[in-house]
Structure formats: C-alpha cells, structure tokens
Amino acid sequence: MGEPEKRAGTHGIRCFAKIKVFLLALTWAYASKALSATYMNSMLTQIERRFNISTSIVGLINGSFEVGNLLLIIFVSYFGRKRHRPIMIGIGCAVMGLGCFIISLPHFLMGRYEYETTISPTSNLSSNSFLCMENRTQTLKPTQDPAECVKEMKSLMWIYVLVGNIIRGIGETPIMPLGISYIEDFAKSENSPFYIGILEVGKITGPIAAIWLGSFCATIYVDMGSVNTDDLTITPTDTRCVGAWWIGFLVCAGLNILISIPFFFFPKTFPKEGPEDMANETKNDEGDKHREKAKEEKRGITKDFFLFMKSLSCNPIYMLCVLTSVLQVNGFVSIFTFKPKYLEHHYGKSSSEAIFLMGLYTLPSVCVGYLISGFIMKKFKITLKKAAFISYCLGMSECLLSLCNFMLTCDNVPIAGLTTSYEGIQQSFDMENTVLADCNTRCSCLTKTWDPVCGDNGLAYITPCLAGCEKSVGSGINMVLQDCSCIQSSGNSSAVLGLCNKGPDCANKLQYFLIITVFCSFFYSLSLIPGYMIFLRCMKSEEKSLGIGLQAFCMRILGGILAPIYFGVLIDRTCLHWGTQKCGEPGACRTYEINSFRSIYLGLPAALRGSSYLPAFFILRLMRKFQFPGDINSPVTDHVEMMLTEKESEHTDVHRSPQVENDGELKTKL
C-alpha cells in the first residue's frame, strides 16, 4: 500500500485522531453507562412493587448485571487490547442500549398495574365491603385460584428485567478496561491522573442525570394516560405506589445507542502525546506493528495471557489492591442499592423524594472530590508512597465518620398489631404480633391485606376493617373513614388513608444524616484517585488491560453479584408484613422493623469497609519496606515515564525472557 493509505488506516478521520477527542467520547460513554446503572438502582424499589417480588429477588436482578459483565470481562480486557479498542467500545454501548430496551418491555406486555386493596375508590353503599360489618366476609379483589399463581404469565415478567440487565452488563464490559488502557497507552503520563479524574467526573454526571430522571419518573403513575389517577386510593408514600419506571429505560436505550456512533470512527492507535513523539509518529507506528508481530510469533497470544496472569498473581501489592477493592465494593453496593428503600422506610419519604435526596446530597460532593483529587495528583506530582498514605487516611476518615449515622435513628411507625399494641404500647420485633383485637373481632377482617389507615389517635392500622371503621366519606386518596371502634378511646373515631407521618424530630435527623452523607462522599471520592493510581502503577504496562479486567472480574463475582443478593435476604428477614398477590401468595414486603433494618443497612457495610483497611495497611507496609525503581521520592508521573522508556527498550529485544525483572517496573515479593 501507499504511504497515504497506510497513514489513513492508522489515524482514521483527522478530527477523531486526537486523544482528547477520544477522552470526550469516552467520558460520554462513562456518563451513559453510569446513567443506566444509577437509574436501574433508583428504580429497584419500583420494580419490586410492580412485579410484587421480594427484596432478595430484587438483589438477584441487580446482581445479574455483574453476571453479564463477568462472562466476558477478562477475555475482553486482554484480547481486546490486541483488537480495535474504540470499535469494541462502540459495540458495547450499542449492546447496553439493547439491554435497556429489553428491561422496559414488561410494561408493554403486562397490562395495567393492579395493586393489592380491598378499598373501592368511591364511598357508595354498594362498595363498602372493605369496612367493618358484621356477618360479612371480606375478599381481596380480584380473587383467583392460588394454583393459577404459578401459571400466570405476569408473575414471571421480572425475568425480562433480569435478562435485559445481563445484556446491559455484557455491553458495558469493554468500556472501562479498554478505554483506560487506550488512554494510558497514548496519553502523556503526567496527564493520565487528570484524564482519569475527568472520566470519574463522567461517571458522576451520569448519575446526577439519572437521579433527576428517576425522581421525575417516580412522580408519574406507572400507567399514566390509561387510568384515572383521581380514583387511586394510595398516596405517594404508600409502599404500593409505583412510578413510571419504564420511561427512563427507554431514554437510556436511545442515549447508549447514540453515544456508540463516534467510536466507530476512531483509529486503532494514536500518536503518543508530546512533540517528541509527534516527530517520530510514523516510525513509532511501524515499530509498534513490528514488535507486536514479533511477540505473537515468539510466544503467541494465549501464552502471553497465562504469563501475565502468573505475573499479576505473584505481585503482592496488586493482589492486596484487589482484595481491598472487593471488600469496598461489597460495602458500597449494599449501601447504594438499597439507599432509596432505607430513606423511604426509615425517614418516611416517598420514592421520588428518596431518589432526589440520594442524588442531591451524594453526587455533587463526589464529583468535586474526583476533580480536586485528580488536580492535586497532577499539580503537586504526588509520589507513590504519599498517594498511598493519603488514600488510606481519607478512606479511614470516611469510614469512621459514617458510624455517626447510627445515632440518627427514627422509631417505627406505630402500627397496631405490628409495632405497637392496640393500646399504643410498643412491641418487640420478636414478639408474636396479633392484628386482631376485641374492637375488631366482630368485623371478619382479612389479616394479610395491606390497606393502611392513620387514625386520629396517632396509630396506624393495617386496614380500615381492622381499625373497626364502619363508614367512609369522599373518594380516592381524600377518603375519610368514620365510626372506627378501635380509635374511639381517643375521643375521635376517624382515619385517613395511608400510614401516619413521621414526627418533626425524625425530619431533623434526616437532615443530619444527609449532611454526614455529603462529607463521607467527599472524603471517599478524594481517596479513590490516589488509590487507583497505586493500583495502575503496580503493574507492567502490557499487563494493565488484563490487570484492570481481572480486578473487575473479582469485584463483580465477589461483590457485585453476591452483595445485593445476601443483603436482600437479610433485609427480607426484617419484614413485618408481606403484601399479598391476587392469588393469595406472598408478594413484596410492605413494612419493616426499623431497628433491625437500620442495623443491617448501616452495620454490615461498615464492617465490610472497615475490614478493607487491613489489606490496605499491608500495602502501606510493603511500599515502605521495598524500594521502587529510581528515586523512591520521585513523583508518580516520573515513575510512569521511566516505565514507558524501559518498556520501549524491552520491546527492542524480542528474545528477552518475560521472567527477567525490568529495572523500571515495580517488583515486590512477600
């Protein structure tokens, strides 16, 4: 071929042959994948209610994303480095879009959402069967043969969400390992921390948009346009209320496909940033091709794979970094996945408010932390040892500060027969709760239905019938229940739909909880960039793509997949009252024992994150005991430039054994 054709094949379209343009596109891809992931997490409670499933199944759905990622992560990370990385990233974005579309499909296949209730939307006499009446048996509407529960197609529609999430995970696989290795290969070493900081900001701007989108969709009723919302008998804070969860997934699908387009125009390789490399651009391109061909002829791709795996496994700092990451991910996934649920049940917020607060008080501080951390690493040229120490101290500070949340507790909502007696005396979670009392035994009430009402006496009751209410006035959510025999001792005997509101003291504690969340998020994000640079610099240059992928593999199989499942199982154990499907089988949990829920939600992640600082401590010890190449006080960027220079000399001699230690690479032994 002629020289022009050769250069065109190497550098592609001129406007795309710049590392900063690729960085911009990759930042958008990071934002898009983070948008999809965060929106999925914000909608887990909505999905749980829509499909009437337990929290453990929701955890399985959430972990299915990691299953899809796990299927390909190591092979994509290693073999993808030897292929056209931008095109593989573009294909991944398009596959993510397909997965998001599949997740939204059940809405169009299931029909309207029918929540569990005995209450009729109007108060006419012919529809008052949900009230306390002697010699009449209540029924849950509509009823169905329990044997049909398994056969009902709609009961298994959550599998579409599971499969779509797996496909979304497959699509995300190439973005991080191939994108970061691409930047590491062609960016100036001194710019690398700053570029990674920009990518991390992209990972935050996506969630910010997702929080806004999730909060907006949660305010819209799931079947908007096809039902009269004035006839609904559930309030926004009701645990049966479901928002338009499917809209956001359609938005994510379109955005992922749109963002995939630019990656098909980037070249396979870039000229290295810097004037000295630009001058020798053609020479370096030819040298890279020659060296790659020589390596493949001598050892082969598969042999390299196992040699790199062995090298990484014998690198103690790398292995300790992976262990630290696994423990950190277990704690982070547990906190982030169920944070909306915690805000709803512990502080009495609606789904929309919980999603909005989670984003408002978490994401901006994380974004600022990433930017400041990346800027400091670039500006002051932090050494490897200082970076490790800074990361450790900031992480420990965040972990200790988060323990203050244990003091910001709210009490259980007083629910007669569950958390309190009918006389208002608080009951223990371990006690056998009895929802029937002398005031409602004559009413022949259903005991498994969830239709909560709040009485004038400040107590909530599971249904109007169990409150002993005999009359109703009004319609929809404005309905008022009167002549309630279980409330009469307070002087009034009326009730309104929904649980009673949390007190002002609980609202104040929520504000302190959110303020602590801001500082914890900021400290945690400050610690990530220095810690991640230690992780990147402890590997040989040619091992980075595989090393990143192997770390992601471990984090997903030991954290991303398992954490939401076992965490969901533990949360289910704190459930006080399960919902009921139309066929009578248990559905989603309607209310939790708050003290037990809080202990699991805050305690388990604190234990996991706290234990992660033990291997981190050994990393500090190893870095102090062993000498790094060159001056031990040299900055991270100088260290990387040395690695790149010596990597070049290594490639010049293709017969050199991979077992030989390179003077410019980190080699430590326990």
UniProtKB/Swiss-Prot annotation:
Record Pfam families: Kazal_2, OATP
Residues that carry a glycan: N52, N124, N135, N492
Signal peptide: none
Record's keyword terms, sorted: Cell membrane, Disulfide bond, Glycoprotein, Ion transport, Membrane, Phosphoprotein, Transmembrane, Transmembrane helix, Transport
Main location class: membrane
Annotated membrane topology: Multi-pass membrane protein
GO terms, molecular function: bile acid transmembrane transporter activity; sodium-independent organic anion transmembrane transporter activity
Residue ranges annotated for the Kazal-like domain, each copy included: 433-488
Keyword Secreted: no
Gene3D superfamilies per record: MFS general substrate transporter like domains
Modified residues annotated as Phosphoserine in this record: S634
Chain segments carrying region Disordered: 276-295, 647-670
Positions in coiled-coil regions: none
Cytoplasmic compartment residues: 1-20, 81-86, 185-203, 268-311, 378-381, 537-545, 624-670
Topological domains annotated Extracellular: 41-59, 112-155, 225-242, 334-353, 406-513, 572-605
Location in or out of the cell: Cell membrane
Single GO biological process annotation from the record: bile acid metabolic process
Disulfide bonds: C439-C469, C445-C465, C454-C486
Cellular component GO terms held in the UniProt record: basolateral plasma membrane
Segments traversing the membrane: 21-40, 60-80, 87-111, 156-184, 204-224, 243-267, 312-333, 354-377, 382-405, 514-536, 546-571, 606-623
Stated role: May mediate the Na(+)-independent transport of organic anions.
PANTHER family listed in its UniProt record: ORGANIC ANION TRANSPORTER (PTHR11388), SOLUTE CARRIER ORGANIC ANION TRANSPORTER FAMILY MEMBER 1A6 (PTHR11388:SF84)
Family: Belongs to the organo anion transporter (TC 2.A.60) family.
Protein's name in the database: Solute carrier organic anion transporter family member 1A6
